[in-house]
Regions:
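Flexible, active-site-adjacent loop/turn segments at secondary-structure boundaries
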Residues: 21-26, 46
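A short, exposed loop/beta-hairpin motif centered on an aromatic-Gly-Thr core
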Residues: 24-35
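Short, charged, surface-exposed hinge/linker loops at domain edges
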Residues: 1-6, 34-72
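Short aromatic-glycine-(Arg/Gly/Cys) micro-motifs in beta-strand/loop hairpins
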Residues: 8-23
Length: 72
């Protein structure tokens, strides 16, 4: 099974927020997308083990979303 992680930019807090429907309990934030991905890489295996699922290695699929307004 591939575990999907969604990273969304929170413009109000100026952080990236990661959540996953596939990994119960996963909610992390960081100021950079790279740092957030690293945090997810560290937390996901532990959360999956605590929830009684997962295997080693754990396949993760990241999607990111950021909306911005630009002047014309």
């Amino acid at each position: 099974m591939e575990y999907r992680v969604k990273a969304i930019w929170d413009d109000d807090a100026h952080v990236w927020v990661a959540t996953s429907e596939d990994i119960p309990g996963l909610t992390l934030e960081s100021g950079s997308l790279d740092a957030l991905i690293e945090r997810v890489r560290m937390a996901a295996p532990e959360l999956l083990q605590l929830n009684g699922s997962g295997s080693d290695p754990v396949p993760l699929c990241f999607t990111s979303e950021r909306h911005e307004w630009v002047a014309i």
